[in-house]
Amino acid sequence: YRKRGYSVIASDMMTYTKWHLITQIMMDREPRFEEVDIPSHHVSKYQAVLDYLNNLEPVEGYFFREFSPGGTPANGTASRKYFSSENACKIDAIRETINKWIASNCLSEQEEAVLKHSLIMAVNTVANISGTYGYYLAELKKNALEPLVLLPVRFSEGNIQNNRVIQGFAEDIAQEITADLCYIDPPYIKRQYAANYHILETIARGDYPEAQGKSGLRDWWDQHSK
């Protein structure tokens, strides 16, 4: 509908979905990243930022500790295998750099959205899972051994005027919206998105929650579908 000139309002409870939606319906070109102080080397600043993040030195941080076979979870459970140790260290390095840029006011909301969207998409390609992040596979499969790489977003043409992205529960947001056409996705009561995609939510928020139990779930009850 955006490509046909309509204004679009999109909402979801999850933070990672918010970043996807901002990238998809509120942007039609790559952001400039004017406040990020890195050399561009004759490529666009956006590509330079991706190259910089892709080539960071690995960091043995939160993701390495909690979600890789080389780590030792804080709660004393056996090491988890959501990612290879190498990719977990890359995720840590990229997350910490994005967090540093946010703290220094170097990123606009759209720039933050694009980077976190790209990181989440890259993470999905190397995750050692069967479909969701409810649990990991016993052994690292082939795709999990591939290196994590941030790829540029292909921005699409279309209307971006008066588009809105809202994060919250549909039953609350519906009272604020007037629209000609509405699509409402039914809630997932048994397979809660907040639990099954907890790792993506942690990447989206840029935080360091307590990883609970054997699977390393974050506290997600405030986002559960009712």
What are these regions (language model features)?
Residues 161:
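RNA-interacting cores
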